[in-house]
From Swiss-Prot:
InterPro entries tied to this protein: 4CMD/NDH-1_regulator (IPR052512), AhpD-like (IPR029032), CMD-like (IPR003779)
Protein's UniProt name: Uncharacterized 15.0 kDa protein in nqo9-nqo10 intergenic region
Transmembrane helix among keywords: no
UniProt entry keywords in alphabetical sequence: Cell membrane, Membrane
Subcellular localization, as worded in the UniProt entry: Cell membrane
Gene3D superfamilies: AhpD-like
Length: 134
């Protein structure tokens, strides 16, 4: 990252934090990682309701929607690590295999680049390791 880009990025973060404070002062200290610890996985029934066939009877099932979400987050690079960790965990709970998750991430290398793919794979592997420990 160039210094100019880094400075711009920091200004954007600061601006976002100021906006959050203006809308809701309680959001000033919101930490997505704390949210991840609070709700490690969403119950399967809720997953199916939100991402599955409840609202989209003829649409995609929860597993497919979550794999698409993993792809979208991967393309963003390392900007949404807690969200990717939660989505990988949710996809596993919805029946996705580690191989399907990895293939989804590999496919995104064409759109997000190799560094984004590598970071997403590292995050997915850390989720797998946590799941294996439990």
């Amino acid at each position: 990252m160039t210094d100019a880009f880094q400075k711009l990025f920091q200004q954007m973060l600061q601006s976002g934090q100021e906006m959050a404070r203006a809308f809701n002062p309680a959001l000033e200290h919101f930490d997505m990682r704390a949210m991840e610890k609070l709700v490690p996985t969403i119950p399967a029934d809720m997953l199916e309701m939100w991402f599955g066939k409840t609202f989209n009877r003829e649409g995609l099932d929860a597993k497919t929607r979550l794999l698409l979400t993993i792809g979208a987050i991967t393309v963003q690079g390392a900007l949404a690590e807690p969200q990717l960790r939660m989505t990988v965990r949710q996809a596993l709970a919805a029946g996705a295999t580690k191989r399907e998750i990895a293939e989804t991430i590999f496919q995104m290398s064409m759109f997000g680049g190799l560094p984004a793919m590598q970071k997403a794979l590292e995050i997915a592997q850390s989720v797998y390791a946590e799941e294996d420990e439990e």
